[in-house]
From Swiss-Prot:
Organism: Mus musculus (Mouse)
Protein name: Kremen protein 2
UniProt remark on domains: Binding to ERLEC1 is mediated by the oligosaccharides linked to the kringle domain.
Ranges for domain WSC: 120-214
Localization: Membrane
Length: 461
């Protein structure tokens, strides 16, 4: 009877340790693009060929390109992401990431990188436009100053969901039904530079680069479980005297925000985060006080974001991802992120982002509690096992010799094990001991595996 319980205990032990290790939980970032700027200047991925999945030409290492304009030596602070690697980057603000390649017979020594994961959220892709019928069936127009945001703004004012740029100067508007019947084209087909911005691509010949008009909007109500909010006029720079607001509502007990890009001109350009129900200021960031680099969790059911720029403000702006979390171990906001504890901070400066004195102690306390709980369960299981085994007044397990039922003869020596509450004591049985001869007759010899398990258990006591 004791052996099956012992084997069950040994099988449960790794499982309990695994559960204890998982008690802290983990958070996974949303599966979004690796790029949040339209030209991929923020790409920090690991593609090192000009094509996806090893297609195209291999890139040269940035620390071996000193003969060219850009190398790791020209980026000592790592601002452009260059270093002792050969990953695609965009150090000069070109229309998309690129890399140096071994010079070809045509004298070409660099190539653009086709990176499927480097398309800013809100960009839906490159599509064929044959003109009959047009890929997007709404109104259209042309401009010699066309940028992505100029087209987005035009279609937003017309009340359409989608905006498409083509051939560097043409803009088309459409709806979701147009996209459903659209024909995707290779991403590299949309390679025409926008007439109004040298760092943006505006489709190609007979190719539409299609965007959601919500990109760079100045207001909106967001209820999707997760998504992205851009500063006004994005991917262009935000303009002066902007006063914009967005509402995130009913996404969960906790909201998690992560700033993927934050570049404001100065301290007079400011982003505020407020609880909708109370109006309390939760956080505030500006050009002099940027947000923390990691996820920011706020205990609020609905959040109001307000952005204001002064009369001179011009900068790239911001891009943030959000997602709603339930009030569980995985999504629980820390006390300093709660609405009540932040309501008294009118400035929203960086002091509100730093950990409070009790945060580390609370985290340690939680870990200690989970550890004590797990080992309490292990102790209860061990005590239950000992109670079952206590029915035997003596278990005989020989040493290196053969099993002897009774007094030891020869080099082997018998052992009598008395289990008492709450622990066991192992003592050698002297020759002729009644404990070794009497009760042993009522029990079968232990198997080799049981002897090994018992020996391990005794040594641990």
């Amino acid at each position: 009877m004791g052996t099956p319980h012992l084997q069950g205990f040994l099988l449960l032990f790794p499982l309990l340790l695994r559960l204890h290790g998982a008690s802290a939980g983990s958070l996974h970032s949303p599966g979004l693009s690796e790029c949040f700027q339209v030209n991929g200047a923020d790409y920090r991925g690991h593609q090192n060929y000009t094509g996806p999945r090893g297609a195209g030409r291999p890139c040269l290492f940035w620390d071996q390109t000193q003969q060219h304009s850009y190398s790791s030596a020209s980026d000592p602070q790592g601002r452009w992401g260059l270093g002792a690697h050969n990953f695609c980057r965009n150090p000069d603000g070109d229309v998309q990431p690129w890399c140096y390649v071994a010079e070809t017979e045509e004298g070409i020594y660099w190539r653009y990188c086709d990176i499927p994961t480097c398309h800013m959220p809100g960009y839906l892709g490159c599509f064929v436009d044959s003109g009959a019928p047009p890929a997007l069936s709404g109104p259209s127009g042309t401009s010699t100053k066309l940028t992505v945001q100029v087209c987005l703004r035009f279609c937003r004012m017309k009340g359409y969901q989608l905006a498409g740029v083509e051939a560097g100067y043409a803009c088309f508007c459409g709806s979701e039904s147009d996209l459903a019947r659209g024909r995707p084209a290779p991403a590299t087909d949309c390679d025409q530079i926008c007439f109004g911005h040298p760092g943006q691509l505006c489709g190609g010949d007979g190719r539409l680069g299609i965007y959601e008009v919500s990109v760079g909007s100045c207001q909106g109500n967001w209820s999707a479980p997760q998504g992205v909010i851009y500063s006004p006029d994005f991917p262009d720079e935000y303009g002066p005297d902007r006063n914009c607001s967005w509402v995130l509502g009913q996404l969960g007990a906790v909201l998690e925000l992560t700033f993927r890009l934050f570049e404001l001109a100065d301290s007079r350009d400011r982003l505020e985060l407020r609880d909708v129900s109370s109006g309390n200021l939760l956080r505030a960031f500006d050009g002099a006080h940027p947000p923390p680099p990691g996820p920011l969790r706020l205990r609020t059911a609905a959040l109001l974001l307000t952005f204001r720029s002064d009369a001179r403000g011009h900068a790239q702006g911001f891009a943030l991802t959000y997602r709603g979390l339930q009030d569980t171990v995985e999504g629980r906001a820390s006390p300093e992120d709660s609405t009540e504890s932040l309501a008294g901070d009118p400035d929203g400066a960086n002091a509100s982002c730093s950990p409070k004195p009790g945060a580390a102690q609370a985290s340690i306390g939680a870990r200690v509690f989970s550890t004590v709980t797990a080992f309490s369960v292990l102790l209860l299981l061990l005590l239950s096992l000992l109670r079952l085994l206590r029915r035997r007044s003596c278990l005989l397990a020989p040493g290196k010799g053969s099993l002897a039922m009774g007094p030891s003869r020869g080099p082997g020596r018998s052992w009598a094990v008395w289990y008492r509450r709450p622990r066991g004591v192992a003592l050698p049985c002297p020759p002729g001991d009644s404990q070794a001869e009497g009760p042993a007759a009522g029990y079968r010899p232990l198997s080799a595996s049981s002897q090994s398990s018992l020996r391990s258990l005794v040594s641990a006591l």
